[in-house]
């Protein structure tokens, strides 16, 4: 039985070393991205979205009439949409591992995926710009 304990410990140390190397080096980018795919990414109809389907969803809107349900309210900016969108793009460009995956210019809705630094776990962000 003691022999099994040493063997198991050795296997776990090797597995931990492999995962650590993959997580801390660019070598792990592709395998972790493949393991942690976000699934089907689609546009959201904020007026119809339900919080019941996804417990890890957090919905923020400027007013209740734009969203079916919401967790918090956003600020309302006194700016034209093109200027606001340009500033948004500047801020998004500063975020590490952020990728635009869907864009609907007509609805002004954009879907981004940002991955965590170590395991490349995906977070999906959807933003839509509304005119006053």
Question: What kind of region is each of these model predictions?
Answer:
Residues 4-9, 19-132:
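Ser/Thr-rich, low-complexity intrinsically disordered terminal regions
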């Amino acid at each position: 039985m003691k022999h099994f304990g040493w063997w198991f410990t050795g296997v776990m140390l090797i597995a931990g070393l492999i995962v650590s190397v993959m997580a801390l080096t660019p070598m792990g980018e592709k395998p972790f991205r493949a393991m942690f795919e976000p699934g089907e990414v689609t546009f959201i109809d904020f007026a119809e979205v339900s919080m019941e389907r996804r417990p890890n969803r957090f919905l923020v809107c400027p007013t209740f009439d734009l969203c079916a349900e919401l967790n918090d309210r956003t600020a309302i900016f006194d700016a034209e949409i093109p200027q606001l969108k340009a500033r948004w793009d500047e801020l998004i460009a500063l975020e590490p591992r952020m990728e635009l995956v869907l864009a609907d210019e007509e609805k002004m809705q954009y879907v981004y995926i940002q991955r965590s630094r170590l395991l490349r776990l995906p977070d999906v962000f959807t933003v839509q710009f509304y005119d006053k």
